[in-house]
Amino acid sequence: MKQSKMLIPTLREMPSDAQVISHALLMRAGYVRQVSAGIYAYLPLANRVLEKLKNIMREEFDEIGAVELLAPSLLTADLWRESGRYETYGEDLYKLKNRDSSDFILGPTHEETMTSLVRDEITSYKKLPLNVYQIATKFRDEKRPRYGLLRGREFLMKDGYSYHADQDSLDETYLDYKKSYEKIFERAGLNFKPIIADAGAMGGKDSQEFIAITDDRINLEKWLVLSKNITSIDEIPESVLSEIQEELGKWLVAGEDTIVYAEGGDYAANIEMATSQFEPNVAYTEELELEKVATPGAKTIDEVSDFLEIDEEQTVKTLVYHADDELIVILLNGNDQLNEVKLTNRLGASFIEAASEAEVEEKFGAHFGSLGPIGLENVRIIADRKVELIKNAVVGANVDGYHYKNANFGRDFEVEEFVDLRTVNEGEISPDGRGTLKFARGIEIGHIFKLGTRYTEAMNANILDANGRSIPMLMGCYGIGVSRLLSAILEQFARIYVEKTPREEFKFSWSINFPKELAPFDIHLVPVNVKDEAAMELTSELEEKLRGKGYQVLVDDRNERAGVKFADSDLIGLPVRVTIGKKAAEGIVEVKIRATGEVVEINKDELVNTIEILSK
C-alpha cells in the first residue's frame, strides 16, 4: 500500500484539547479525527486496527459456537417500554420521533431487540441454547463526552446474547465467554484483570468486568524505548529523565474504574463491589454504662475523636438517605465511607440520594454532626457489618453539641440488619484471606452478565420445557467496547523514544508501539529519496518480496524530507521500519524494530530472515 494514496493526516504537535495520551496520539498520528463532540471518524489506519480486532473476536467466538448477525441501530421505543427501560434508562438515551410521531431510539444496547427476535422464532427448549453476537455502532447521549474514544456519544461495540432453557446451560456459556474474552485480550497484548462487578442498569445477578490497567506512572523504564547508541537508562542524564517524567505527568491516567485486587492472591473486584476481612474492635470486652456527654463544636468524626480522645474506630456515624420513597438511616464505623452501589443493591432501590441537612433537622431535630441511632422511631435503620463488632461506641445524641459514649447495639438501639455497606481500603485482607488489597486504575474493555429472566420475563419470551410447561428463557449478555479497546491499547503501548545525537544530546518523542497482531501494517518501507532510482527500484523489489511472504507493507512513497518521514513513521508505530537510503545501489538497507529500538544494517537478501529473528 502506497502511503501517498492513504489518508494519514499526522500533526507536528499534540492536540491541545487532549487530556489522555491515547486521544493525543490517535489524533496526532492520523488515526482518527473528531467530527463533533464525542463523535469520531476512524481513518484508514484506525479502521485497519479495528478490523484486526474484530477478526480476533470472530475467531475466538467461532470456537464457542457464537454466531454473528447484525441488528438495526434505529429501534422502536415500544420494545423498551416492554422491558421498562424506556422510562428508567435516563438522559443518556437518544429519543426521536419519525414523521408519524412514533417513538424511536438509537440503540445503546440491544437486549430488547434480540429478545424480541428470539421470542418470535423460538418456542421450544429443543432449539436452545442460542448464542448470537454483533459488532455494530452504538449511541449514548453522554453529558460530557471526553477522553477521545473512551467516552463518546457514538462508539463501536461487540454485544453478544445467549438464551437458555436452564441455569447449567447459561453458566456454561457464561464461562465460555469469560475464557474467550481472556484469549482476545491476551492476543491484543493487554495487561488486564477480570473482576467482580455491579450489573448496573443492565440488571441481572452475576457480572464480571474486564479492566485494562492504566495507572503505571512509576515504572519509567516501561515507557522508554532507547536508541541503539544508548545501552541503559542509567546513561540518560537526570535532567532529561525529569523532563520525561514531567511529560508523562501532563497526561491524565485514563480510566474511570478503580479496581481492587489481592496482592499475592486471585481476588479482584470493582471498588463498588469489593469486600474484605477486618479485625473486630477489641478495645472493650464488656458493655459499659451509657453516658451522654457534651461535645461543643465537634461535628466531624475527627473533631469528636479528638475532643473525646478516642480512636475513630470507636465511633459510629449516622447517615440518612432517600431510597425511592423511603427514608433510611445508615450506620457506619466512623472512619469508613458508604458504598452507594452496595446500598442500592441491598435495598433493591431504583434511586437513592443523601437527605439534605434541612430534611434531617426537620425529621430528627438535630444536624448530621450530632445524629445517632438511639431513640429514633418510625424509621428503618440498617448498619454495616463492622458496626456490629463495635462495643461501647460513641454515637450522636440527636441533640446538637452532644454525643453518647458506650452505646451498644441490642441494649441501646436496634438495627434491622447488618450488611456490607462500606468501601474497602488498601492494605485490608482479601475476603478469601489470600493477600492484602491494592487499588489500581483502569479502563473497562469488556463486561459479561447473567441476566436470568430480567428481560425475557418482562417481554414474555417463553418456551415450552421438556415437561410441556411454559417458562421464560434464561439470558446472558456479553459486551466488548471495540473502539475504546483501541484507546486502551494505546494507553498501554504508547512509548517515549529516547535517542542520543552525534553531539551527545539526548532527545525524546512520543511514538506508538502496536502489538504485532494489531498493527495496521507489519512493515514500513521508507525510501529516503523518492527521486533516487536505485532506492525506488529496491523499494519495489522488497515490497514484492515481503508481500509474497505474507507481510502487510506500507510504502512511504511521498516526496518529503527524511526527517518528516521518520517522524511520521515513529508516530504511526508499525512494528518494523526498513529504511532504503544512500546504500540502495549496494543492496544495503537499515532495519529498525519498534518494540526494542534495535537498528541493524543488512543486505537485502537477509531482510526476511532478519525481520523474523528480530521480531521474535
From Swiss-Prot:
- Give the Pfam families listed for this entry: HGTP_anticodon, tRNA-synt_2b, tRNA_edit
One GO BP annotation is:
prolyl-tRNA aminoacylation
* EC class (word): ligase
Enumerate the catalysed reactions: tRNA(Pro) + L-proline + ATP = L-prolyl-tRNA(Pro) + AMP + diphosphate
**Keywords in alphabetical order:** Aminoacyl-tRNA synthetase, ATP-binding, Cytoplasm, Ligase, Nucleotide-binding, Protein biosynthesis
> SUPFAM superfamilies of this UniProt entry?
Class II aaRS ABD-related (SSF52954), Class II aaRS and biotin synthetases (SSF55681), YbaK/ProRS associated domain (SSF55826)
GO cellular component entries: cytosol
Q: Which GO terms describe its molecular function?
A: aminoacyl-tRNA deacylase activity; ATP binding; catalytic activity, acting on a protein; proline-tRNA ligase activity; transferase activity
Q: Which CDD domains match?
A: ProRS-INS, ProRS_anticodon_short
Say which domain of life the source belongs to.
Bacteria
Where does the UniProt annotation locate this protein?
Cytoplasm
Q: Which InterPro entries match?
A: aa-tRNA-synt_IIb (IPR002314), aa-tRNA-synth_II (IPR006195), aa-tRNA-synth_II/BPL/LPL (IPR045864), Anticodon-bd (IPR004154), Anticodon-bd_dom_sf (IPR036621), Pro-tRNA-ligase_IIa (IPR002316), Pro-tRNA-synth_IIa_bac-type (IPR004500), Pro-tRNA-Synthase_IIa_type1 (IPR023717)
Q: What is its EC number?
A: 6.1.1.15
What do we know about how this protein assembles, alone or with others?
Homodimer.
Q: Which family does it belong to?
A: Belongs to the class-II aminoacyl-tRNA synthetase family. ProS type 1 subfamily.
NCBIfam families (UniProt xref) = PRK09194.1 (NF006625), proS_fam_II (TIGR00409)
Identify the PANTHER family for this entry: MITOCHONDRIAL RIBOSOME PROTEIN L39/PROLYL-TRNA LIGASE FAMILY MEMBER, PROLINE--TRNA LIGASE
The function of this protein is: Catalyzes the attachment of proline to tRNA(Pro) in a two-step reaction: proline is first activated by ATP to form Pro-AMP and then transferred to the acceptor end of tRNA(Pro). As ProRS can inadvertently accommodate and process non-cognate amino acids such as alanine and cysteine, to avoid such errors it has two additional distinct editing activities against alanine. One activity is designated as 'pretransfer' editing and involves the tRNA(Pro)-independent hydrolysis of activated Ala-AMP.
- Domain-level remarks: Consists of three domains: the N-terminal catalytic domain, the editing domain and the C-terminal anticodon-binding domain.
Under which name does UniProt file this protein? Proline--tRNA ligase
